[in-house]
Amino acid sequence: MTKPIAVVIGATSKWQSDGRNTRMVHGGNIPDDELPLSIRWGVGGAIALKFAREGFHVVLTTRSKPNASALEAAIYSEGLDCMTVELDLESDDSISTAFETVRSELGDPEVVVLNAGYLEGRDLPPEMELLENMPVELFETAQNISSRGPFLVA
């Protein structure tokens, strides 16, 4: 019997030890081993680990495969199954290619978790925090990631 498949869209977090937002909040680099495994990759990583531990073959999606390498290694280290597929929610072709890869290598997913987010604009200078000051390009990207992309995934 094959394992059920869970695709986690947005499986990696921008709050990794070398991430821009981690440095912004904590004032410097934090070694990975100082971040507990349970929070190292944020909600997406926690969801991926949970599904893997429950017997699913987990597909980690991220815009760049290296972003998921540590999470993938952690899942493999527990003897669990996963694979990483590049997926950019702003690209129709990327979405199609990612799911073609999943289907050809594993089969149809039973679960798709939409966890992608977009942080830009949250760290605008205080004098620009109002929505009216947000550049239209940031708004369009946020809409593509949170609305249009998931629609295309479905």
Q: PLM ranges: what are they?
A:
Residues 8-10, 114-115, 146, 154:
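Structural signature of the Rossmann-like NAD(P)-dependent dehydrogenase/reductase core
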Residues 110, 118, 132-151:
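Catalytic Tyr-X3-Lys loop
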Residues 102-108:
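Glycine-rich phosphate-binding loop signature in dinucleotide/nucleotide-binding domains
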Residues 66, 86-98, 136:
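The beta1-alpha1 cofactor-binding region of Rossmann-like NAD(H)/NADP(H)-dependent oxidoreductases
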